[in-house]
Design a protein with these regions (language model features):
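Feature marking well-ordered beta-strand scaffolds used for ligand recognition
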Residues: 1-150
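Surface-exposed, proline-anchored Ser/Thr-rich loop/turn motifs
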Residues: 152-157
Length: 157
């Protein structure tokens, strides 16, 4: 049996190479990243498939050419591997006004026109630690038991 299309969103701000996304635990908010330099992260209201809409757009605020990759929502927090800008954590408890609450730089950028730096993030370890993979500098295990206050590098090689 072939899949049945339930909905589409083909027109939205900074439409590009829609590379990755993650659905919130309640199934109402979807965070998506178009893997293009300078394109914002989008938070979508997907509570009604007949009326999918962009709630907000935002970025790391570091550079006009920054690029988000492979975000994961856990509770009210969106964890983003942000290439040159490292790990970025946003509070999305109010999806209309996401707020960056923490960050950890894994890569010193020299140019934003390449795919270098933090590529993946995984915040779902039982310990509460976060794993961040950086294509140039390796694997980071970060203590993120309270991401709003601080992140500590436990081990990196």
């Amino acid at each position: 049996m072939a899949p049945t299309e339930l909905a589409t969103l083909t027109s939205y701000p900074d439409a590009g190479y829609n590379h990755s996304g993650w659905l919130s635990d309640d199934g109402n908010t979807y965070a998506m990243q178009d893997e293009n330099h300078g394109y914002d992260v989008k938070l979508l209201d997907v509570s009604d498939f007949n009326n999918i809409s962009v709630i907000s757009t935002f970025n790391s605020g570091m550079n006009a050419q920054c690029m988000a990759h492979n975000g994961i929502i856990k509770g009210d927090l969106l964890y983003l591997a942000y290439y040159h800008d490292g790990l970025r954590i946003f509070d999305i408890s109010d999806p209309s006004t996401p707020t960056q609450v923490s960050s950890y730089d894994t890569y010193s950028p020299t140019s934003y026109n390449s795919y270098k730096g933090a590529w993946g993030v995984y915040p779902n370890l039982p310990s509460g630690n976060i794993i961040v993979s950086d294509m140039q500098s390796g694997l980071y295990i970060l203590d993120c038991t309270n991401p709003i206050n601080s992140i500590e590098n436990i081990n990196s090689n």
